[in-house]
Amino acid sequence: MTDADSAVPPRLDEDAISKLELTEVADLIRTRQLTSAEVTESTLRRIERLDPQLKSYAFVMPETALAAARAADADIARGHYEGVLHGVPIGVKDLCYTVDAPTAAGTTIFRDFRPAYDATVVARLRAAGAVIIGKLAMTEGAYLGYHPSLPTPVNPWDPTAWAGVSSSGCGVATAAGLCFGSIGSDTGGSIRFPTSMCGVTGIKPTWGRVSRHGVVELAASYDHVGPITRSAHDAAVLLSVIAGSDIHDPSCSAEPVPDYAADLALTRIPRVGVDWSQTTSFDEDTTAMLADVVKTLDDIGWPVIDVKLPALAPMVAAFGKMRAVETAIAHADTYPARADEYGPIMRAMIDAGHRLAAVEYQTLTERRLEFTRSLRRVFHDVDILLMPSAGIASPTLETMRGLGQDPELTARLAMPTAPFNVSGNPAICLPAGTTARGTPLGVQFIGREFDEHLLVRAGHAFQQVTGYHRRRPPV
């Protein structure tokens, strides 16, 4: 286990390159101390060496990645620089459409699906000069379980530790230096779980902040697309590129997109709220981490006050039922016609969606609206809500074996995450501690709708005084 070295040596080997943050490697490419081709070749070698064990990639794209890297180098040599992502290897979750690679979404049904167009987020990455290096592994259909015939990504900190779902490949690859940032999705915690478990940084934006066009649905009104990186600064760079209105996605907001990375200094001290009454179900590692975060915020002068949130646990239960209905709709073309090709966890969830009565669904919709109204009232008093990034601290694979089948386990995990998919509020997940066995713990800063800029600035400030984001796994 080593700390990333902020002092960049004159010549970098594969290991040193892999430890750089996105913005650090981007600066070396921009100043031509490294070429994009060198960085891409180094990253591909690292993938070839480590990913047979880590299993973070569903598809690696060496030919197209190297072609994009060489094109980036030629552009930069001519003085045509597109911005921070130009020439930087980025991975995308395998539910984002890509014209040059299959999009299987963690399934076997779609393993040969070749989209005719890129997802909007992928098109925006390419337009910014990013090198798409591969498609990252995930759970089946972005739900809680892996398809039985497909490999499971391995946590680079500890192979016995859970890597999170469903953007597990994103978390593993970003932590292990197999890309310099990635694009994941989050329906109930799927950016925040892997970032927490793998010790990286992730943003679940406001619902509608980032286009979902060309992204395979799990549950349309809960799905959020966002970045996973090593730092808040890096996440700000990616979010600035992928956010914004899209004529192909009518649910995508026309709210103006600031340059989140242009000015990372806080313009005022944020007021932070914690509802301690809803943290009693968390384990000892999680509550100790939260207490340490509160002490850190107090030390830097941020007021932390007690707040009363609407009840989270009932909303997790409601979310589970409503998500199942939306998933059943999303899979109508292949389920039940090809039900035998689905894994058991995904099958059970879709079946539950088919069984839910319309009257109950409408009742749950009313509860969703009331929860969102109540949450907005809390944000009259605070700017940020504090929550762990998962309801269970760095569990083992054995502990999580029943996920998706054990309702109590699933509810415990999702209590601090899924309610904010229900409301659509943005959240940034930050490394914030470690367990006794050295595995990472994460904290969430949750903000008002479309207040990602404050979250990025607050996350950056937190990372300047903690440094957990500079830890690297022992691979």
UniProtKB/Swiss-Prot annotation:
Catalytic residues (UniProt): 93 (charge relay system), 166 (charge relay system), 190 (acyl-ester intermediate)
InterPro entries: Amidase, Amidase_CS, Amidase_dom, AS_sf
Entry's Gene Ontology cellular component terms: cytosol
Assigned keywords, A-Z: Hydrolase
Gene name of the record: amiD
A Pfam family this chain is assigned to: Amidase
Annotated organism of origin: Mycobacterium tuberculosis (strain ATCC 25618 / H37Rv)
EC number(s) from the headed UniProt entry: 3.5.1.4
Catalytic activity field: a monocarboxylic acid amide + H2O = a monocarboxylate + NH4(+)
Family: Belongs to the amidase family.
Full protein name: Putative amidase AmiD
Superkingdom of origin: Bacteria
Alphabetized Gene3D superfamilies for the sequence: Amidase signature (AS) domain
Enzyme class: hydrolase
GO MF assignments: amidase activity
SUPFAM superfamilies for this protein: Amidase signature (AS) enzymes (SSF75304)
